Amino acid sequence: MNHMVQYQHLDQSFAALSDATRRGVVEHLVRSDASVGELAERFAMTLTGMKKHIAVLERAGLVATEKQGRVRKCRLGPRRMEEEAAWIERYRQMWDARFSALDGVLEDLRVRT
């Protein structure tokens, strides 16, 4: 499988979550759904600015929106970030193993001196 295709979801998710406001929106939506206007007010930004953030999160599948009358409601999207969590865990384990090996080397050096 092509690397670009294989990691497309990861790229979109990590790019979407690279912004503090967008991470804050996801954290807020974990607790409760909210309208775009409510989110804009909560994060002290314009409606237009918040719509742009929501669009990025929506393209990544992290947020879903639905028009309810004149209000656009936001909720967590269909993606559960399992692929992202698995990728992070794989690298966390690799770094743990490397640090454990380094600890062993340092302990050997300490014992020798």
Show the residue positions of the predicted features.
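A general lysine-centric signal
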Residues: 51-52, 67
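A cross-family signal for key residues in well-ordered alpha-helices
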Residues: 15, 27, 58, 64, ...
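Residues in the helix-turn-helix
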Residues: 49, 56
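Active-site phosphate/pyrophosphate-handling residues
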Residues: 24, 55, 100
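N-terminal helix-turn-helix DNA-binding core of bacterial DNA-binding proteins
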Residues: 2-48, 71-86
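Beta-hairpin "wing" of winged helix-turn-helix
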Residues: 58-69, 73-75
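Amphipathic alpha-helical dimerization/coiled-coil segments
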Residues: 1-9, 27, 82-113
